[in-house]
Amino acid sequence: MHHLPCLLLIRHAQSENNALEDRFRVPDPGITELGVAQSKKLAMAMAKLAPTVVYCSPFLRSLETTRWIAKQTGAVPVVRQDIYEQGGCHSGFQAGRRIAQVGMNRETLSRQYAGWHLDERIGDEGWYDLDHFETADEARNRAHQVRKWYESESQMHSDRDRVAMVIHADFKLRLLEAFLEEDSIEEQLGDIVNTSISRLSLSKGRWRMDYWNVFSHLDPHEIST
């Protein structure tokens, strides 16, 4: 395996759904006023970490969080289709009644995030490619595919690269399970704070977690989960 840079896994800022009861949630919420404040603080922290590559989920809450990172660091984000939240884009909140939604399409993303790189899998209809609410097992399989892709990209990175992914709480857990080769990691870890940063690095052929859920860039009143 060629050199692989460390990987920063970042949860998006507080979304409008995070601040609402389940029954009021919408398929693709933006971020709240608190979320904007969190994003600004995150962006300042990321300027010090100086990521050279920033991948983000196609969900609006990740895109809006990433916009602040891009402004502060100058990195041009890459919107990847396959790092969305577990469950996918859907309406409804009750088990068995969730209906798949397609998410933003390529034209909308190109217009709202001009200059960003868009995954070729994001099409004219939208980015969510399943016709159902994604299961936990499907999300785990997807996380393993993301790991395989990241490791296959090793020859594309230099020793100076620092890679960040702006993603979601549940899929962050699935990625940790895939990279750390753990069956279930949820019970070992606490709540994931909005805009918290975790870092993975490769050592002697195995991935390790250098730190988890760091949110020291936030003031106490800005912390949310």
Locate each region found by the language model.
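A mid-sequence, solvent-exposed acidic-amphipathic segment
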Residues: 130-158
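Surface-exposed cleft-lining segments at the edges of enzyme active sites
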Residues: 25, 93-96, 123-140
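A short acidic, helix-capping loop that chelates divalent metal ions and anchors anionic groups
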Residues: 17-19, 86-92, 127-131
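Active-site metal-binding loops of divalent metal-dependent hydrolases
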Residues: 13, 169, 213-215
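Active-site-proximal alpha-helix that buttresses catalytic centers in soluble enzyme cores
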Residues: 5, 10-79, 136-140
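Acidic, low-complexity terminal tails and accessory targeting/binding regions
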Residues: 1-6, 86-115, 155-161, 177-225
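Beta-strand elements within well-structured catalytic alpha/beta cores of enzymes
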Residues: 6-11, 55, 157-168, 175
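Phosphate-coordination/substrate-recognition cap region in phosphate-metabolizing enzymes
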Residues: 42-119, 190
